[in-house]
Amino acid sequence: MVKLENSRKPEKISNKNIPMSDFVVNLDHGDPTAYEEYWRKMGDRCTVTIRGCDLMSYFSDMTNLCWFLEPELEDAIKDLHGVVGNAATEDRYIVVGTGSTQLCQAAVHALSSLARSQPVSVVAAAPFYSTYVEETTYVRSGMYKWEGDAWGFDKKGPYIELVTSPNNPDGTIRETVVNRPDDDEAKVIHDFAYYWPHYTPITRRQDHDIMLFTFSKITGHAGSRIGWALVKDKEVAKKMVEYIIVNSIGVSKESQVRTAKILNVLKETCKSESESENFFKYGREMMKNRWEKLREVVKESDAFTLPKYPEAFCNYFGKSLESYPAFAWLGTKEETDLVSELRRHKVMSRAGERCGSDKKHVRVSMLSREDVFNVFLERLANMKLIKSIDL
């Protein structure tokens, strides 16, 4: 039986006037506050001093296609990918964005603008990242159109397939589904937000036309709003840069400088054998611990389901490892509206229907603060007990 901590309101976000029974656990979003404790222990190693006269210009490097990319961030990105071995950076253009969300929109815009006919179909295999729907429908562009689930897509003409691997929300390793290798109008955007060794085995060095990464899910620094794209084709990269210029006239330099500093510190910790010092070892152990606790709660219940992930050899750690995804794809064996049932127990989650799936599934963030996660486990276990009593 899994041992749960005594219930208490999470210290940093609780209101002392709210009883514990009324506290709402919000695991709908992927706010990665789980890593706060690690970075707190790092003390001043990530501190950046910015004077009032620093970083005032729009421009960073006018010789770079992405002229608002700070050179020190570009170097830090290349160095980290080199150490981890998860993506090729040679002969590529690095485009920085305000998170990978802006970069995904920029990539869809770029590929659509270069297509021979429009609107270009945009698809993703279900269950898919729910925000893809919003990103491709919100501005009602005539250049592209959301066509939904890639599994059943057979429409002729240009299309863009969004491939997230490991997948958000279910954590599975994904490849393209539509697969039209001889079609020069077939384009793919690979989202590798979670392809890092604390979440999944690094099985190969990814080498695709457009690869997206986000600072927030590597280190937990979501508030910095930094992402980057590794792009092979110069014209696509130029179009992406143009989109970002029109959308936000570049990307915050303060955020870029801070990101570069933290990525460099992270890279240095990779040399350490200490689990408390080496960020990826720390993160993997934390995620393993959380997944083991969640699986124990689910095992003791006959009501819930979780995916199983095969072991794979991780080139970074040099051994076979399991995956510990950033989100849990929680299901129920009954024909139950699970998001509503969890809400009834004051747990917020992402409805499976928003991800192209069904009401029996929800996406639950595994990246909350430890005390919030423990409250979630206790409430999930209590739902199991209520189920048993009803039977």
UniProtKB/Swiss-Prot annotation:
Cofactor: pyridoxal 5'-phosphate
Cellular location(s): Cytoplasm
Pathway membership: Plant hormone metabolism; auxin biosynthesis
Activity regulation remarks: Inhibited by L-kynurenine.
Disruption phenotype: No visible phenotype under normal growth condition, but exhibits reduced levels of auxin (IAA), reduced auxin response, reduced sensitivity to ethylene and shorter hypocotyls and petioles but larger leaf area when grown in simulated shade. Defective in root gravitropic response and shows an increased resistance to cytokinin in primary root growth.
Modified residues (N6-(pyridoxal phosphate)lysine): K217
Catalytic activity: L-tryptophan + 2-oxoglutarate = indole-3-pyruvate + L-glutamate; L-tryptophan + pyruvate = indole-3-pyruvate + L-alanine
UniProt note: pH dependence: Optimum pH is 8.8.
Tissue: Expressed at the leaf margin and in the vasculature of emerging young leaves. Expressed in the quiescent center and in the vasculature of root tips. Detected in the shoot apical meristem, stems, sepals, stamen filaments, the shoot and root junction, the stigma and the base of the silique.
Effect caused by changing G171E: In tir2-1; loss of activity
A cellular-component GO term for this protein: cytoplasm
Keyword Translocase: no
Induction: Up-regulated by trans-zeatin, ethylene and high temperature. Down-regulated by auxin and shade treatment.
Origin superkingdom: Eukaryota
InterPro entries: Alliinase_C, Alliinase_N_sf, Ethylene_sulfur-biosynth, PyrdxlP-dep_Trfase, PyrdxlP-dep_Trfase_major, PyrdxlP-dep_Trfase_small
Binding site for pyridoxal 5'-phosphate: Y58, S100, T101, N168, D191, F192, A193, Y194, T214, F215, S216, K217, R225
Record-linked PANTHER family: BIFUNCTIONAL ASPARTATE AMINOTRANSFERASE AND GLUTAMATE/ASPARTATE-PREPHENATE AMINOTRANSFERASE-RELATED, L-TRYPTOPHAN--PYRUVATE AMINOTRANSFERASE 1
Family statement: Belongs to the alliinase family.
General function of this protein: L-tryptophan aminotransferase involved in auxin (IAA) biosynthesis. Can convert L-tryptophan and pyruvate to indole-3-pyruvic acid (IPA) and alanine. Catalyzes the first step in IPA branch of the auxin biosynthetic pathway. Required for auxin production to initiate multiple change in growth in response to environmental and developmental cues. It is also active with phenylalanine, tyrosine, leucine, alanine, methionine and glutamine. Both TAA1 and TAR2 are required for maintaining proper auxin levels in roots, while TAA1, TAR1 and TAR2 are required for proper embryo patterning.
This protein's name: L-tryptophan--pyruvate aminotransferase 1
Gene (UniProt): TAA1
